[in-house]
Amino acid sequence: MKKSFLLFLFGVAFSLTSFAQQTIIRGSVLDGTTGEPIPDVTITIEETNQTTTTDAKGEFSFISNVPLGEQVLKVEKIGYVTKRYPIVVNEGSTVDISGMTLDYDPGDKKDLFTISISDDNLNSEDDGLTDNVSGLLQASRDIFLSAAAFDFSSTFFRPRGLDNANGKVLINGIEMNKQFNGRPQWANWGGLNDVQRNQEFTMGISANDYNFGDLAGTNNIVMRASKYRKGGRISYASANRSYQGRVMASYNSGLLKGGWSYSFLGSRRFGAEGFIDGTLYDSNSFFAAVEKQINDKHNLNFTGIYAQNRRGRSTAITNEVFELKGREYNPFWGLQNGDIRNSRVREIEEPILMLNHYWDISPKVRLNSNVAYQFGEISNTRIDNGGTRLVTFNGESSFLGGARNTNADYYQDLPSFFLQDPNPSALDFQQAFAAQQEFINDGQFDWNLLYEGNATVAAQGGNSIYALQADVIDDSQISFNTILDADLADNIRLNASLNYRNLNSQNYARIEDLLGGTGYLDVDFFAEEIGQDVTDLLETVAQSDIRNPNRIAREGDRYKYNYEIDAEVVSGFAQAQFKYNKVDFFVGANVSQTNYQRTGLFENGNFTGTGPQGSFGESEKLDFTNYGIKGGLTYKISGRHLINANGSYFTKAPTIRNSFSNARQNNFTVTGLESEKVQSADVSYIFRSPIIKARLTGFYTGFEDGTDIGFYFTEDLAGLGIDNGDAFVQEILTNIERRNIGIELGFEAQVTPTIKLKAAASFGQYTFTNNPNLYLTSDDFEGELRFGDGTTNIKDLHVAGGPERAYQVGFEYRDPDFWNVGVTSNFFSNAYIDASNLSRSANFTSDFDGNTFNDFDPATARELLQQEQFDDYLLVNVVGGKSWKVDDYFIGFFATINNVFDQQYTTGGFEQSRLGNFRRIREDQSRDNGPLFGSRYFFGNGTTYYLNVYVRF
């Protein structure tokens, strides 16, 4: 008994002695102006791989594997000037460096980039064409990603060839990516720059605390009231990119007595037009967060976001139009009563409400549970020129009406249309010259024509032939998740989460404006009888809803199409992180279940019936089970030299957009639909010293079983007969395989305390690696239309999506008197046009009967189908700022000038698929005065500026 007791006392004494001899570094970080603690500050022991962050009280500690001797602590946080603190660590002692301060950084570029990603890129046709630097807001600490975010993004550049659908954006741990297309809708929190500064970014597929992640990284925007520094900010911005002016005001309380904290923000952005003509901007944004610290273990936070955004849109144009009108031309706007009015207006209004509970179960175990509700609509307007009226004569019904295409750049209004013959006549030249002068002097949308046309028809007792239509997505989504973060040991950490999302999406067309008319007959004027059955009679086929035939739609009514999509996603994730003296590594896995179902609320006349083969009622229920595994390793050669490697394999459910072949008209699902398979790997060499930082990365990503759907009007489809080759089609591609490989480099050198040199480079190749399956569907023919072996020959073509190669050199100067200036030169090359899939199918070689053209020439065909590579270009950008401290106020400005030398360049484009066979394309491309249906291009902005003036207190 005595022996046991003595052993017990010895054990206690040994433990106490060991504890007393433990080497510890601890401290705290305060705001240099307010003296308030700063949470989420990154503390790094330089030339080691040891990093930690401050807690809500601004405190931190290193308690294991602490290096001895002279060390340097690097203290950094976005929005503050980075500082370095030298310390001396003795074995068995505690170094207490409490009260370190960080000063506000008036030259931080975060505000600028939030503008870029949230505002400039909302004009994309597919919600992802230009907002291609997903999750890089926090990534400015990485040299290469900083260049990609601030200087490369205006060119459609995509790091590693990945768009926003390959990255995850979270707010307070809740995923914000849309289930419709997999992309984050940045406009949902646009204009809230001041409350987006607290972000946690994880690059690529590496370990993160919240979910499995994705190839382009994971960005968690922390919008907790307690995480904002105490104080307020008022600012005004002037620009000529997307909006012309922005006013913003915000205030954060900091932690108050009783454990309360709150944060509020309001902003307005406005402009008659941006750099592109006629692109109006009208947006109001509001934010509120309130948090209660219930006790030392529990915090409850509420966040509300309302960001309404209304914007005029623009489009790609042909070279002919560009030569006549320039890169600022936009065919969508015209004057109405002396005011600019855009026919294509996009409006987004989807508020977000969320409640977050934070539970510190113990010092080593934390549980975060969240619930969010998002609702509202996205609408896109366009002109409907298919208005008609029903006429019955001798017992037969027909529809009279319809109108000419109203597009301002319609091909029949351009000079090339009148000069299409090989030997134009004098009259042809006269008409071409008249068209040229009319287009140069005006060339804008004619609103008066629409009102006059409707007035004329109304006087004759007819319905409107023109109307302003809005395509509406009205979503309601609820999200739940719970996130576990546990320290299993000093060097082992467990992350896990469970997630659930439920979406009800109503999709319909709505009459926004009858343009002076009295009503709109809800039928398809362009419908055709495609069968011999009595049910295919035109009066039936043309109906948008045969359960309510020949309905007259008024303003605010749903018409044309009306359906719901229900979607549900359940997922689980687990990850373990291990840290040792020489090696850190992690492993992670996830599993998910996704299901979609369409419910038709209109029974379309072209696709009568209920169930999966009709248009009314419920479609087949699509179910996808997916999984993923990932791992990574960091080998610390020394404190300055590191090797990092990551690898993953995972599957992804197709998006809603790519699951239904024509959701607006029927319940048909994509034939051969599968989850996409993704494999990726990257290896990096990292060098870090007090003067030089560098990262060199090689990466590989492979994609299999991808799916994509496109919509367009085309002519001369093979095999349908001489009179039946024209159709508006849905083009479905399945079994798409792609490969992205390349190298990234980031380098910076702090050559003096005030001057920093920097360089970045990306050398990539992003190509298709097989010939995917292709088929067409349409209401102009029955079934699925395939050509030849059913594939399109795009193997080895480049995936369109900005330049594959980008290079930067630049410098920054930061003066001790609180002003700074920076200049970068950025070179871009190897950008390619988006190739037509139809032109590379067997349809290209076949006539209307499906036979091969007798004059087909392979050499000419290769020349016609050569994928266009855009010209290289160089852009120079300048950035600078200055701040003053007046009593307790900071007053300052921040300015940028992009494309200083007004370089003209092409950022993207696509081949039109209107002409899809060898003879028609050869004929069109060989015209002396230019093609009628040439490729369309997006052109980059000229010289633009952004100026922000602010007061912070």
Residue spans of the language-model regions?
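C-terminal beta-signal and adjacent terminal beta-strands/loops
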Residues: E704-D705, I709, F827-T845, D849, ...
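Transmembrane beta-barrel wall of Gram-negative outer-membrane proteins
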Residues: I24, S238-G271, F275-S314, V345, ...
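Short acidic/polar hinge/loop motifs at secondary-structure boundaries
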Residues: I63, L136, L145, I174-I205, ...
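Gram-negative outer-membrane beta-barrel transporters
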Residues: K579, Y700-G702, D726-N837, Y950-R952
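N-terminal periplasmic accessory domains that precede
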Residues: D96-Y104, D126-L137, T155-R158, W186-W189, ...
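Outer-membrane beta-barrel signature, preferentially recognizing the C-terminal barrel domain
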Residues: N330-I352, N356, R554-D557, Y561-A567, ...
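Surface-exposed extracellular loop regions of Gram-negative outer-membrane beta-barrel proteins
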Residues: R310-G312, A316-V321, L538-R554, N595, ...
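Acidic/polar loop-and-plug regions of large Gram-negative outer-membrane beta-barrel proteins
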Residues: E291, N299-N356, S379-A470, D533-E555, ...
